[in-house]
Amino acid sequence: MSFVLSRMAACGGTCKNKVTVSKPVWDFLSKETPARLARLREEHRVSILIDGETSDIYVLQLSPQGPPPAPPNGLYLARKALKGLLKEAEKELKKAQRQGELMGCLALGGGGEHPEMHRAGPPPLRAAPLLPPGARGLPPPPPPLPPPLPPRLREEAEEQESTCPICLGEIQNAKTLEKCRHSFCEGCITRALQVKKACPMCGRFYGQLVGNQPQNGRMLVSKDATLLLPSYEKYGTIVIQYVFPPGVQGAEHPNPGVRYPGTTRVAYLPDCPEGNKVLTLFRKAFDQRLTFTIGTSMTTGRPNVITWNDIHHKTSCTGGPQLFGYPDPTYLTRVQEELRAKGITDD
């Protein structure tokens, strides 16, 4: 059975922008061949974020990225391309695992630098039991070297180090970004940062991003010691209310001059140290007008409304990731990654 699943069975039609994948396959793809992911993101103008997880799978969410208008059928084509890329990664992972097992068997059976010399023949005669090296006055042998990477993976890793992820040619006048340490041709990354001040590989933001969230909104925060979230029962709960009155779209919005209705959204965080850290980052994102935008609702299909802007909030106390609630063991870590991609950090 393939590790790559098209979607979770419980998602239904609302998950057409989601892909479910086994953790080993995603980790292999994102760590061994990040240039492929970067090229997919750039060609299809999408972001790919981890939206939920279980013990053995990730739920990936694809979202349009870049200036409007989005390409027709953009998410469908991006999702199809991602599924194909994941299937290729799955095959390569299985092949690498088989090669690793074979090399491990040879290493165990050989016992030296030339295992082919020990494949046949009787075992060597021993005159007496061997003593530990220290007991014979000899220094202990050095620890064994780890098995080398399979040749294909080693060549691909070396190629990635010298290949620009933007132009896919050999890096010319290498420029390494300070925070994430990804390297590019100087000319390629200069042009890319003029379009969007973020690393094309990982999305790490460079500079301060200001969004188009309506300016007349308020972020209200209160704490409820009696409201307990699953997995955080020894803490109280931070309750966040976002309140927006009706208004008129400005020049930075999809339909300037068109009215949009008001809305109120409620979100929950555990009142623990990590939850309060996320609250501070949420305040920064709200002040930089990044938490919401104006567009078409993904749930109702209604246009010209205030919608979330790819910073996931827990709008339910319970129900797990499928119902936007708790428990969700890695949510606080994931949402900090989403915020970091928009340049919102605690430094």
Curated annotation (Swiss-Prot):
Residue spans, zinc finger RING-type: 164-205
Stretches the record annotates as Disordered: 113-157
PROSITE patterns to which the protein is assigned, alphabetical: ZF_RING_1, ZF_RING_2
Any one Pfam family match given in the protein's UniProt record, by short name: DTC
UniProt GO MF annotations: ubiquitin protein ligase activity; zinc ion binding
EC number: 2.3.2.27
GO BP terms: Notch signaling pathway; protein ubiquitination
Compositionally biased intervals (Pro residues): 121-151
Main location: cytoplasm
Source domain of life: Eukaryota
GO CC terms: cytoplasm; nucleoplasm
Cell location: Cytoplasm
Pathway entry: Protein modification; protein ubiquitination
Catalytic activity: S-ubiquitinyl-[E2 ubiquitin-conjugating enzyme]-L-cysteine + [acceptor protein]-L-lysine = [E2 ubiquitin-conjugating enzyme]-L-cysteine + N(6)-ubiquitinyl-[acceptor protein]-L-lysine
Keyword list, A-Z: Cytoplasm, Metal-binding, Notch signaling pathway, Transferase, Ubl conjugation pathway, Zinc, Zinc-finger
InterPro entries reported for this sequence: Deltex_C, Deltex_C_sf, Deltex_fam, Znf_RING, Znf_RING/FYVE/PHD, Znf_RING_CS
Main EC class the enzyme belongs to: transferase
UniProt similarity note: Belongs to the Deltex family.
Summary of subunit composition and partner proteins: Homodimer. May form a heterodimers with other members of the Deltex family. Interacts with NOTCH1.
Function: Regulator of Notch signaling, a signaling pathway involved in cell-cell communications that regulates a broad spectrum of cell-fate determinations. Probably acts both as a positive and negative regulator of Notch, depending on the developmental and cell context. Functions as an ubiquitin ligase protein in vitro, suggesting that it may regulate the Notch pathway via some ubiquitin ligase activity.
Protein name per Swiss-Prot or TrEMBL: Probable E3 ubiquitin-protein ligase DTX3
Organism lineage string: Eukaryota, Metazoa, Chordata, Craniata, Vertebrata
Gene name linked to the record: DTX3
